[in-house]
């Protein structure tokens, strides 16, 4: 596994600057939530840093690494390209960053779906929505307050907010 310093060095070259800052915010927010809920801080750090590592891959690259990583797609997941960076990210984290911890890989894999989440997965899912640069999301302050008190209620609120946003943009919403 690469050191965190090496991961950050690579990510800073592969992500847009704003996405890199977002990833740092997810890492830091996830660690704060880990302290509140008694989750493993190192797992939260690594999943937070790497959750968007495949964000700027082409569709072809994402599908290729998903296949190479042996990641199975959920029904309809391949019909909405923005969802694919999560399974591609899990595969990339494993194959290129040396992450072998299945819990970390699962948190990266599920961070766009909210499907049947354990504590680590819930923390990454919510941290992705509430990290400090996410000031443009309507209802984010309410979501932040909820996250510090009930992480699984915050997961449900994130799902609701995401569904409402997708519907308002005319995107098809899949029940995953």
What are these regions (language model features)?
Residues 4:
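Active-site hotspot residues in diverse enzymes, especially metal/ion-binding acidic/histidine motifs
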Residues 8-13, 31-153:
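Divalent metal-dependent catalytic cores for phosphoryl transfer on phosphate-bearing substrates
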Residues 17-19:
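A short, charge-rich alpha-helical start-of-domain segment used by transcription regulators
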Residues 22:
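N-terminal glycine-rich anion-binding loops that anchor highly charged ligand groups
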Residues 155-157:
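Glycine-rich, aromatic-bearing surface loops/beta-hairpins
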Residues 161-176:
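Charged phosphate-binding loop/patch that engages nucleotide di/tri-phosphates or the phosphate backbone
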